[in-house]
């Protein structure tokens, strides 16, 4: 069903039993976020908050809380969207299948944005920032934030929608040093289109005009986070997914979405920053306070009976998890088509997305040789780390399509449950085991030091700075993985647990990376090749890590800075290449420079428990 507004979507969800109305007045300070999290964790419906303390406007969240609900919302337009993306990725297919192409033409007409000729913000009233639902999500947050903002900017050299960018960059509405109703904070990370626009404006010494849209058809929200093929703008995509052309106009030189519920316009002046944050973010930790651009508010608009759309982020999975699932469902092979030889890629949500990337490539360089070792997948890995958002990956595990012969399988894999063909990257535990069976730790580890990394990742040396590790393995199985603790590990006199075959967590209470490295010196090859121990994790709580595979994934890959926190048993450097003969040792302890993990406010939790009882949660 095509929706012209956020309210139309919510009413349709209600008709189909997918909406919960909270009729009591709720506090935007922590309480609304806690309600959202409780209902999300229960796989509950979308939520409409009818009375928000301190604001006359309603608010909605958990709209995209499950993949099933997201697919329901776009049930009538998803096929056409996927078809158009396929045509954009592979124009030859359009020639080969002309009937399919013709059927996509009506949807393509919705891709053309529609400018309102009156040049007025139709049906809007002018309000202040203080009139909005000022929702603070977590106790240590610096203030209230917009968490589903559609931030629109244009290229100052080529103004107009044709060279615009629409992205989702959080907005801080109050707190810190911001002057209420006059200033808001604009936080954006590396590899974002808005950065290109601000750089150009700065070079000319001119302010960058910014428009922030909130609400409107749900298709607009999805468009802001889509990795789109070259030449397809977010507004094109929004129109096709909504089955309604993206409506806009200009007010005082600022672009205004005529379908949005709220619009905030303002300017970012060169060199004008203010402290932004902290904010409890999607890695499960607070992103700390740092200088980011301050936006001078020009005007704030709201439609009559507008609905404030928001989400709550934290340690995965959260509502943004289903965003990722929906994106994968829509785009399919878009990314792998962009990188020659790449077959599959998966940013692991449980690790916070950017910290852990899994990929399957191809090995076609030397098919005439029996020697099987990484070659083409190293080229593919470099391409991945030079491509858009994929370049923010901290750990990249990459292998190639299976090549093991039946004879090899019979020799190497008898009595072993590990897959002999490469599992899908979406089967994370199986994929890691497949690689750990094949990895040559003296050859297959490639560190990238002193490089950029995700703004939200505090495992590195400084903001936006750290290291990366490419683990590239290809070939036959080299070893079986340990499923019980070897004597060499139990003799360390430290609490130890098997996390998964080949991976062991050891308590940091009595041991460190270096103490273990010293105690196991000279025993590395036996421990790795005969005992099957591939990775030793040092952590404060190995029992907790062993409880749940996702605990291991989250704690390890968010807390480890590869160049600083990884050592190996019997390690060395040859021709500037680091490797080891024994297991890798990861220091996954919490360090002093790490950002704190988010914790719940128990008083608020009690109130939420009482409130939600009557709603069955």
PLM feature segments, named:
Residues 1-279, 284-294, 298-617:
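Extended, highly charged
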